[in-house]
């Protein structure tokens, strides 16, 4: 599903290099210190950065230079980037057509997705009239409505309080299972990773320092847990 073979990106002439394989349907957390290269890894997959060298494969095809809109991925950021003057339905609809000219089938698809994330009764509201958790659900729905097999999340829930964050993690787990999505999620929260992703990548200094069970990091069983301040 996802393969990075010696994918290298230069940051101020310093190479960040990634080797990685993720099977279809896997849920993988990406942890590590600030500035280690976690977001860079996602941006290379999403197409916002172009590798200097190496091969990037997504869903069985090479995508080193494919524009973001033509890659089999959707990406959700910490900032939900909703348009304040558009309704919830219109913000979701942008995932289907930038001009919001939707077919009847697409309107049905939008409503089905909204129902799946619990927004079916909020479609006519503006973002300012809904909660922070509901705004993130709207942004997630906009990703899901595109029906891409790979979902990339860059600290999507860090601005939410613990209860809302746990609620969103549970929702995401259900959505991934229902849609059989392949998920990679950057986070600074090991608890979120433990609840959602059996596998974790620990990125340090532009390299994948650890690739293994999330539980081994949380328990301190792996020596790599020391990077996260966990006693081994």
From Swiss-Prot:
Residues 2-230 form the ABC transporter domain. It is found in: Cell inner membrane. Its EC number is 7.6.2.15. Keywords: ATP-binding, Cell inner membrane, Cell membrane, Membrane, Nucleotide-binding, Translocase, Transport. GO terms for cellular component: plasma membrane. Transmembrane segments: none annotated. ATP binds at residues 32-39. Pfam families: ABC_tran. SMART domains: AAA (SM00382). It is a peripheral membrane protein. Its main location: membrane. One of its GO terms (molecular function) is ATP hydrolysis activity. It catalyses: thiamine(out) + ATP + H2O = thiamine(in) + ADP + phosphate + H(+). The keyword Cell membrane applies. It comes from the Bacteria. Belongs to the ABC transporter superfamily. Thiamine importer (TC 3.A.1.19.1) family. PANTHER family: SPERMIDINE/PUTRESCINE IMPORT ATP-BINDING PROTEIN POTA (PTHR42781), THIAMINE IMPORT ATP-BINDING PROTEIN THIQ (PTHR42781:SF1). The complex is composed of two ATP-binding proteins (ThiQ), two transmembrane proteins (ThiP) and a solute-binding protein (ThiB). Part of the ABC transporter complex ThiBPQ involved in thiamine import. Responsible for energy coupling to the transport system. This is Thiamine import ATP-binding protein ThiQ. It comes from Sodalis glossinidius (strain morsitans). The lineage of its organism: Bacteria, Pseudomonadati, Pseudomonadota, Gammaproteobacteria, Enterobacterales.
């Amino acid at each position: 599903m996802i393969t990075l073979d010696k994918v290298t990106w230069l940051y101020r002439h310093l190479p960040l290099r990634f080797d990685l394989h993720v099977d279809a349907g896997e849920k993988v957390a990406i942890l590590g210190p600030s500035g280690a290269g976690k977001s860079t890894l996602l941006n290379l997959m999403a197409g916002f950065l172009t590798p200097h060298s190496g091969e990037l494969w997504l869903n069985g095809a090479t995508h080193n230079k494919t524009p973001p809109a033509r890659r089999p991925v959707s990406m959700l950021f910490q900032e939900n980037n909703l348009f304040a003057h558009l309704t919830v339905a219109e913000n979701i609809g942008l995932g289907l057509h930038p001009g919001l000219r939707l077919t009847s089938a697409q309107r049905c698809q939008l409503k089905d997705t909204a129902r799946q994330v619990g927004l079916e009764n909020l479609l006519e509201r503006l973002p300012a009239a809904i909660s922070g958790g509901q705004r993130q659900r709207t942004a997630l729905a906009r990703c899901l409505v595109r029906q891409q097999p790979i979902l990339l999340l860059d600290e999507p829930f860090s601005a939410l309080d613990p209860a809302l964050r746990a609620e969103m993690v549970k929702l995401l787990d259900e959505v991934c299972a229902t849609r059989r999505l392949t998920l990679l999620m950057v986070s600074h929260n090991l608890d979120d990773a433990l609840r959602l992703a059996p596998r974790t990548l620990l990125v340090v200094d532009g390299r994948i320092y650890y690739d293994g069970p999330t539980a081994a990091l949380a328990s301190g069983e792996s020596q790599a847990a020391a990077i996260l301040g966990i006693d081994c």
